[in-house]
């Protein structure tokens, strides 16, 4: 998990992401009878690991996602579908970034690594198969302006061939999804203060509008 015209010109095509890694645990999803969930807001920060420069985003994180209630082999919620963020950097430059593919359906969300029943909190990761044509990376995060275009992607696939996993946590009570990722620069065009070797750390939260509840699946 976006409609970013500048990025689409660099990474053309819309392809459904695929996930095939076996989950560490299974989960059941419900959304209060809703068939889709929506992001209603949140915040995010993109930090240059070399310079410490931060790009702050707080004007809204949005997505619309279908819910497959009762699925137990990784929940395909597509939580990054139609995902974009409007941002402002330290110099007041307006930016928009998000994934460049427009479609990230069938992303396996919340492969579980832990569940805290008392807190209603699930920890796990988002797993995307990055081997499909025209999908060089998970979230090809894109920053664009009239002055420069940055395309960012995960620097490596640490957990399985052609896969990239983004750690995330979802808390039922606050309906908050928290995620983070390391990203590296792929296709810069003269961006002041940016080097081709720069890496970035992304962290953000998304508030889910519907009463989405994720629980361990019963055997």
Task: Specify the residue positions occupied by each region the protein language model found.
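Acidic/polar residues at beta-strand termini and the immediately following turn/coil
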Residues: 48, 116, 169-171
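Intrinsic-disorder/low-complexity loop/linker signature
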Residues: 52, 92, 134, 162, ...
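Predominantly extracellular/secreted and cell-surface proteins with exposed
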Residues: 58-166
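A detector of low-complexity, intrinsically disordered, Ser/Thr/Gly/Pro/Ala-rich segments
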Residues: 12, 19-21, 26, 140, ...
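N-terminal segment immediately downstream of the Sec signal-peptide cleavage site
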Residues: 18-84, 182-219
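Short polybasic amphipathic segments
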Residues: 42-46, 124-126, 175
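Secretory targeting and sorting signals
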Residues: 1-19
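Extracytosolic low-complexity repeat regions of secreted or lipid-anchored proteins
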Residues: 156-194
